[in-house]
């Protein structure tokens, strides 16, 4: 055996010794409790407990019911119906019956000192607890009745309708059409069809009794809650008239109850009011995250629900701001007739209507009459010089042209091909200078002209600097001209012309006297 196995064995011995010591000290009740815990966990019964306890003494109902439920019913159902049997609920019901027959007087002093105000707050708080209790008992009934009709929980979703259906059917699923007249005919038809093919088994009599009692408790809690809500709605308009005028009596009562009073509600900032009651709506199955987001009771108010979904977020924000003001006004007993709440609600409704208005259409404006008059263009020496500088040259014009039926020459420039157009085509050896309009031609000043003329008179043989020794021919292109060669050609041509002349061939006689008169 390894060291790890020895350590585990020692720990097991210590645990067994501790359990046996505790069992000996507590007596047979501890063994019974250990048996119940093992039954709840579903781990079976240990051999030691099998020897010490007689399994046949455990009732059949405790074996068929869940262990938690069996233990609670063994205590005379006190743990299951704690709220229904509580003195707090009875006191609130008695208080509501007492004040229901009297007319509520306007509160003049501190609102926290009024007894009926505290009764209203407690009534609204216990109404929320009743919702939790109904949901808990509803889950319990579904767990019990699942063995008899497992498909029923998916066919009837409402807690009160489900309990009425279970109380009407119990173990007898035949003739369900005549027993379920309170349900829609389509639902009754589906239940009757499903009951014929259900895989459930009949429940024992004790289980049926417990299920029936639990359904009756749910119905009774629903009736008590309805009484409390009617009382709160009848009194909330007197306690908080402005708040009730803004969001209604039901939402006002829920907000006051969850905030812990009207004074505490007035201390809430407007940005936190939409989240009040979110957990409550989720618990009772009303809240839908896809629709309501992080909103609570304020989202379920009438003024918000009647607005389209796309503007509800803005409606909640505007309503929350007015609710915060109305709660603070009601806590100091201002505007007891609710005039502020009425005006605030009208203002919110007016703003919502403004949000729902379609966007205003822009009027169709005719196009302006085109101005065909000649535009004024800038002139002057600087503008003319700039135009001449950036004017398109003859070379660029030739490059932009392509001769018909001739291949265009191309050159490569930085990995790009550039066409030359008609540049370099045969028969095109002329280059025309850029034509300049005489009207806009840049002219020299008179002083500069006189200076150039005087320079030309002083040195008439001086070259102007514009002469060139280059010539362009259609055969060889650009040629370099030799001035000496041109002069020699002229001399040769002159000699050739006068070489055959008569006058140039007459020989002079040396014997002839130079002067005939001599």
UniProtKB/Swiss-Prot annotation:
GO terms for cellular component: nucleus; precatalytic spliceosome; spliceosomal tri-snRNP complex; U4 snRNP; U4/U6 x U5 tri-snRNP complex. GO terms for molecular function: RNA binding. Residues 239-357 form the Nop domain. Gene3D superfamilies: 1.10.287.4070, Nop domain (1.10.246.90). The keyword RNA-binding applies. The record marks 271 as: Interaction with U4 snRNA. GO terms for biological process: mRNA cis splicing, via spliceosome; mRNA splicing, via spliceosome; spliceosomal tri-snRNP complex assembly. Belongs to the PRP31 family. This is Pre-mRNA-processing factor 31. It comes from Schizosaccharomyces pombe (strain 972 / ATCC 24843) (Fission yeast).
């Amino acid at each position: 055996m390894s060291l790890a196995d020895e350590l585990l064995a020692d720990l097991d011995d210590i645990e067994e010794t501790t359990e046996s010591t505790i069992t000996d000290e507590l007596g047979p009740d501890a063994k019974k409790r250990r048996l119940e815990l093992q039954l709840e966990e579903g781990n079976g019964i240990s051999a030691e407990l099998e020897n010490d306890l007689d399994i046949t003494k455990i009732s059949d109902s405790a074996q068929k019911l869940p262990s938690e439920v069996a233990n609670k019913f063994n205590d005379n159902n006190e743990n299951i119906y704690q709220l229904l049997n509580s003195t707090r609920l009875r006191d609130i019901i008695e208080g509501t019956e007492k004040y229901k027959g009297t007319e509520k007087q306007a509160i003049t002093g501190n609102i926290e000192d009024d007894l009926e105000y505290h009764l209203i707050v407690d009534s609204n708080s216990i109404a929320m607890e009743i919702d939790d209790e109904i949901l808990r008992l509803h889950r319990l009934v579904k767990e019990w009745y699942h063995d008899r009709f497992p498909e029923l929980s998916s066919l009837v979703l409402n807690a009160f309708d489900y309990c009425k259906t279970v109380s009407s059917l119990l173990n007898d699923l035949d003739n369900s059409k005549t027993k379920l007249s309170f349900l829609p005919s389509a639902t009754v038809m589906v239940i009757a069809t499903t009951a014929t093919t259900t895989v459930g088994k009949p429940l024992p009599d004790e289980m049926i009794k417990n299920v029936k009692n639990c359904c009756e408790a749910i119905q009774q809690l629903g009736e008590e809650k309805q009484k409390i809500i009617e009382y709160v709605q009848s009194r909330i308009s007197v306690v908080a008239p402005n708040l009730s005028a803004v969001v209604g009596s039901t939402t006002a009562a829920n907000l006051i109850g969850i905030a812990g009073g009207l004074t505490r509600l007035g201390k809430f900032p407007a940005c936190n009011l939409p989240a009040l009651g979110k957990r409550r709506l989720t618990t009772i199955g009303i809240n839908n995250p896809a629709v309501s987001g992080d909103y609570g009771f304020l989202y379920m108010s009438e003024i918000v629900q009647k607005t389209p979904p796309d503007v509800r977020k803005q409606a909640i924000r505007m309503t929350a701001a007015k609710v915060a003001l109305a709660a603070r006004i009601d806590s100091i007993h201002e505007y007891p007739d609710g005039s502020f709440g009425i005006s605030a609600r009208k203002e919110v409704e007016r703003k919502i209507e403004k949000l729902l208005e379609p966007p205003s259409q822009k009027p169709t404006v005719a196009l302006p009459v085109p101005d065909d008059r000649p535009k004024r263009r800038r002139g002057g020496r600087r503008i003319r010089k700039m135009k001449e500088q950036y004017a398109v040259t003859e070379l660029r014009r030739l490059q932009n042209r392509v001769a018909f039926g001739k291949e265009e020459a191309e050159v490569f420039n930085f990995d790009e091909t550039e066409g030359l157009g008609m540049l370099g085509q045969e028969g095109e050896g002329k280059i025309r200078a850029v034509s300049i309009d005489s009207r806009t031609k840049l002219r020299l000043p008179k002083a500069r002209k006189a200076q150039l003329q005087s320079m030309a008179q002083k040195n008439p043989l001086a070259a102007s600097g514009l002469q060139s020794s280059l010539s362009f021919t259609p055969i060889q292109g650009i040629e370099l001209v030799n001035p000496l060669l041109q002069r020699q050609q002229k001399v040769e041509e002159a000699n050739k012309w006068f070489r055959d002349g008569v006058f140039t061939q007459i020989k002079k006689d040396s014997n002839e006297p130079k002067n005939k008169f001599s």
